[in-house]
């Protein structure tokens, strides 16, 4: 029914739902699927999601749209991802399992840590390198919290056994069966760890956040 070079899939992993839409070469949507995501609020100001559910719901949406068109993944020319960019996931390189729930962009648990960095006079340096304000909204302090509060996390990170990613990285890791641990500039630039002037992870920022 469709040529194998004309279809593009779009994955949209938002805060409240996962969606997949398949478009033809003219940009006309041919099939779509959407599934809700569960949010958890264990304490005031904390917002979490199950990273496994994120992957499963997104996969179900993609497979559903392919099934509607009687296609397999090989019938797609390309696949694009849009996502909640600051949400933070840390998982085991060996097992592919998250070591903690995804900490959502709305989460404010690291406000006191960010305030200490501000009081230390580090905000101008951070802003100059990243173009961002120093705020719990972004990923860096969330990664620091996981390393400090999940048992054994920092030791495993030092041993090279853990991977960090925003939601796009987590989805690509799973879509590729663990072969691709990647992101792009638009997501990396929302972590507070990425130098926007040279487009590299910044060692000084990593040291500041203790990652």
Model features per residue range: what roles?
Residues 41-45, 113-116, 193-195:
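Short, charged, surface-exposed secondary-structure boundary motifs
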Residues 95-98, 116-121, 125:
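Hydrophobic or amphipathic alpha-helical targeting/insertion segments
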Residues 103-120:
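Short alpha-helix plus adjacent loop in nuclease-associated cores
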Residues 67-105, 133-139, 172-195:
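Short beta-strand-loop/turn "lid" adjacent to the catalytic site in phosphate-handling enzymes
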Residues 1-100, 128:
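N-terminal glycine/serine-rich phosphate-binding loop of ATP-dependent small-molecule kinases
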Residues 15, 26, 126-211:
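Gly/Ser/Thr-rich active-site cleft segment
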